Amino acid sequence: MAFSPKRVKHRKVQRGRIKGEATRCNNIDFGDYALVSLEPFLLTNRQIEAARVALNRKIKRGGKLWIRVFPDKPYSKKPAEVRMGGGKGAPEYWVAVVKPGTIIFELAGVDKNLAEQAMTLAGSKLPFKTRFAEQIQAD
């Protein structure tokens, strides 16, 4: 289940740079537990899928999982050993821009211990530092 947009307005985009903390997608809105990024990174569709598979295997059909990031930015690359010039390379894969504080996954319907184990396992599949977070219950 590779994540990629069905259609895009522009086939190629500029790389840009990731500045600052996340101002959106930084609250636990759906589940009870979350995996939060601590570093800026361009997260690929394959990395999201690897973490999702690891999470689902750990929770074993229990609970509900939300994927809060989507790779909507094309990452283009020129082939190896090609001289400079000749235009921008072809889009290779899709990336999601992840800022520090961005929630990547949310989980509900499982106990805290299992959720923490599953999120830690999913975080180990990702190439940047993450932490486990839980929803604060308002009494």
Swiss-Prot record:
UniProt record similarity statement: Belongs to the universal ribosomal protein uL16 family.
Which SUPFAM superfamilies does this entry report, sorted A to Z?
Ribosomal protein L16p/L10e
Write out the entry's keywords from A to Z. Answer: Ribonucleoprotein, Ribosomal protein, RNA-binding, rRNA-binding, tRNA-binding
Protein task: Binds 23S rRNA and is also seen to make contacts with the A and possibly P site tRNAs.
Q: Report the Gene3D superfamilies cross-referenced here.
A: Ribosomal protein L10e/L16
The beginning of the lineage is: Bacteria, Pseudomonadati, Spirochaetota, Spirochaetia, Spirochaetales
Keyword tRNA-binding, does the record have it?
A: yes
Q: Which organism is it from?
A: Treponema denticola (strain ATCC 35405 / DSM 14222 / CIP 103919 / JCM 8153 / KCTC 15104)
Gene Ontology CC entries for this record: cytosolic large ribosomal subunit
Top-rank taxon, per record: Bacteria
Q: What do we know about how this protein assembles, alone or with others?
A: Part of the 50S ribosomal subunit.
Task: Give this protein's Gene Ontology molecular function annotations.
Answer: rRNA binding; structural constituent of ribosome; tRNA binding
GO annotation terms (biological process): translation
Full protein name: Large ribosomal subunit protein uL16
